[in-house]
Amino acid sequence: MRITVVGGGNIGTQFMVHCASKGHDVTAYTSKPEVFGSHLNIVDENEVTTLEGDIRKATNDPSEAFSDADFIMITLPSSMMRDIASVIYEHARPDAIIGVVPGNGGSECAFGKSIERGNTFFAIERVPAIARLVVKGRTVRSMGYRGELHVASLPASEVDRCCELISSIYDKPCKPIPNYLNLTMTPSNPILHTTRLRTIFGDYKPGVVYDSLPLFYEEWDDASSRLLIACDEEEQSICKALPEFRLEFVKSLRIHYESPTVEAMTAKISWIPAFRGLTTPSVEVDGKYIPDLHSRYFTADFSYGLSIIKQIGVFAGVDTPNIDETLDWYERIRIEQGDFSYSDYGINDFDDFRKFYLR
């Protein structure tokens, strides 16, 4: 299969190695093709190679990358999806399969024109494993592979075919998700990160500085858990208001973390070994600290995460006061502009919304 991977970062490089190791004809579409060698490898935490393979080429020419691709996998941030979707629509075949990872962030709407003309679009719910570049264009470290991957597609009738493809590349079982909206509403980062940031920086405005900041997860507190649970409950109310979309895979964070109470949630999140030592996104100024408003925790998880959940709540007719207050807080302090909006893609009311996702 001719596979083009868009993005030469952590996840993109990992995906290239998995595809190349299976004998696929792999092209990297990247802004810096000159840094790529033909031989790529994955190493573990001990720097031991666990997987390797050869790609055909790296290029920044969209015609070279997409015109003969059978499968295009995109590993870019949500904010870049609209631009890359236009490029792919212009250069790719109408029968090419187009995938993204991870599946939240509204990327499906950017590819609406491609879906309409016949392209199958799908997403993997979450990244298959932790990936960190060791040498750009050559080596990536991968750890913590998920035991099972979840995939949804538009149209939904193609999900089994997409699952088979991803399962064959990663050698992992792949579970088909009945409706793509389950991926759009994945609550992990859009609720986990945003509620914690609001709790830590709730009093922030230009001029306010902090002598010190808590570790983001390891020093998680009850106030953060209380807001997280409130926003999570609001999202679950949205899911209950949309029964025909089969949103049973939008799992409550209380179930995901096995923490039904505020106190249990605090204990669980502050204990998770993979979260230990992770700092709060901040910038040091004269020995003090201010929030790093350019961090993806802000720019992605509010604008392409919690904001989308809010918009779906409006379509469903569900009030979301805690989500609203959290978004209003961010609006007062934000630096970077540009949010995902369904209206940008002609989805202006519930009928438009229903037509898009129930296909």
Model regions and ranges:
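Substrate/ligand-engaging "lid" and interaction regions
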Residues: I11, P128-C231
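NAD(P)-dependent Rossmann-like dehydrogenase/reductase catalytic/cofactor-binding core
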Residues: Y204-D211, E218, S225-R359
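NAD(P)+-binding Rossmann beta1-loop-alpha1 motif at the extreme N-terminus of oxidoreductases
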Residues: M1-E47
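Rossmann-like NAD(P)(H) cofactor-binding subdomain of soluble oxidoreductases
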Residues: S78-T139
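Short beta-strand/turn micro-motifs composed of small residues
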Residues: G7, T30, L76, P102, ...
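Rossmann-like NAD(P)-binding element
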Residues: T50-A92
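A general structural motif
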Residues: G23, A69, R93-D95, G118, ...
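Hydrophobic/aromatic beta-strand patches that form the interior of the parallel beta-sheet core
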Residues: T27-Y29, T59, M73, G99, ...
